[in-house]
Amino acid sequence: MRSIIADSKRLVVKVGSSLVTNDGKGLDHAAIGRWAAQIAALRAQGKEVVLVSSGAIAEGMQRLGWSKRPREIDELQAAAAVGQMGLAQVYESRFTEHDIRTAQILLTHADLADRERYLNARSTMLTLLRLGVVPIINENDTVVTDEIKFGDNDTLGALVANLIEGDALIILTDQSGLFTADPRKDPNATLVAEANAGAPELEAMAGGAGSSLGRGGMLTKILAAKRAAHSGANTVIASGRETDVLVRLAAGEAIGTQLIARTARMAARKQWMADHLQVRGHVVIDAGAVEKLTAGGKSLLPIGVIDVQGAFARGEVIACVGPDGREVARGLTNYSSAETKLIHRKPSGEIESVLGYMLEPELIHRDNLVLV
């Protein structure tokens, strides 16, 4: 089996905390130097590389003299602020040895949820790649809360892959890849060499927590691969402990688990909607509406809405949830939550009599709706 990385030109490489730190005692300068050398080798082959790197909080902990990762959000943010300085400095120093410029980009999920900021981030990253710069990306943990508490850089890597239409996402971890069961508990567990991204059985196989320094277990990596497939990006999950793992993957050697994007690439606008990690509200729709959306490719009409939850404005992305509580779609709503509460369960012909006006006959037009 040949590695999919060999034929991939634009790569997003995610490196976990345990691969750039000395077991929590600050940054491992030698390890970062090796990553810089490998990325320089890939660049020499004509590949474009965006690096998503963890390590800021771990570095901040070391600089502040903390031996355990704090639980309080304000302390995590303080550690991130202190550590981000060191992380950027070390990467810049190591890449300069290969005559490569770097750029620091700190993102939040809110940056990618806003359409204008999303497009600006995309334009900036593509310009940096065109200029031969290696963008080094991390979540802006200093100003966010939910991302520190629940987020992970695996997801961020997938979002970046979608943002720049990357060919592949490489998630480097301290594990060898995805196994059929937890190899620490089951001696019969075997490595999954290749599978389809988004295959339901993968989530059942994945489990277990990540290291104490990082936040992402194997499940987050599987879900990141599923998300990256939205833009047609394949994913490789491999051990960063393997010598020259990036160079060997680029040479075609099969290492770890590769997850292939089999689904059709989403249109850019629909991809942006699908990549919303948080939505302001959702509508519960009946079984008939679920069928029309999923099988018929129809628009969502107010009559198909059972309930309205959350507060949202016209033009925002909302989720569509079936009677069983499962999200089936999301899209840009033509009406606010207050308006939707007045017109739900009503035929489109009655919208004007209820509201005094009719903006659109659909709550969400099919052109602004994406299945999830």
Curated annotation (Swiss-Prot):
Enzymatic reactions: L-glutamate + ATP = L-glutamyl 5-phosphate + ADP
GO BP terms: L-proline biosynthetic process
EC number: 2.7.2.11
Location(s) in or outside the cell: Cytoplasm
Positions annotated to bind ATP: 14, 173-174
SUPFAM superfamilies: Carbamate kinase-like, PUA domain-like
Gene Ontology CC, one term: cytosol
Gene Ontology molecular function: any one: RNA binding
Claim: ATP-binding is one of the keywords in the record: yes
Residues that, per the record, bind substrate: 54, 141, 153
Sorted UniProt keywords: Amino-acid biosynthesis, ATP-binding, Cytoplasm, Kinase, Nucleotide-binding, Proline biosynthesis, Transferase
Taxonomy, superkingdom: Bacteria
CDD domains the record matches: AAK_G5K_ProB (cd04242), PUA_G5K (cd21157)
Stated role: Catalyzes the transfer of a phosphate group to glutamate to form L-glutamate 5-phosphate.
Family, as annotated: Belongs to the glutamate 5-kinase family.
Descriptive protein name: Glutamate 5-kinase
